[in-house]
Amino acid sequence: MKEAISALMEKLKTHSLTFKEVLTFIETYYQHQPTAFKNGEAYNEATQNQGSAKVFAFAQLNNLPAEDTLYLFAEHYQAVLATPDGTDHQNIRQFMQHGWPGVVLEGQALLAK
């Protein structure tokens, strides 16, 4: 798994993968359970923003640092970087501001297959 994650991160850092491809990678190894979570000042119900829930849970389970976690958002992270004063992609913006201390998953969003 460590090698697969390293290869994933290399591709993300060269902007070679989309967010959808990241989610497909995560879903290859984990089963998702809808989970509510808090991220900084943003609260997400179990029916909202589950792509972000998958990313945060995956990054936590694999002890990824905040910087690598942001790369998992692929083109959405790049869009936030391009528009620092924007209001879209609040989960990315909140994570950039609050980091891991701001993320609280209210359950186990991912289970290993």
For every predicted segment, state its role.
Residues K38-E41, Q108-A109:
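Short coil/turn segments at secondary-structure boundaries
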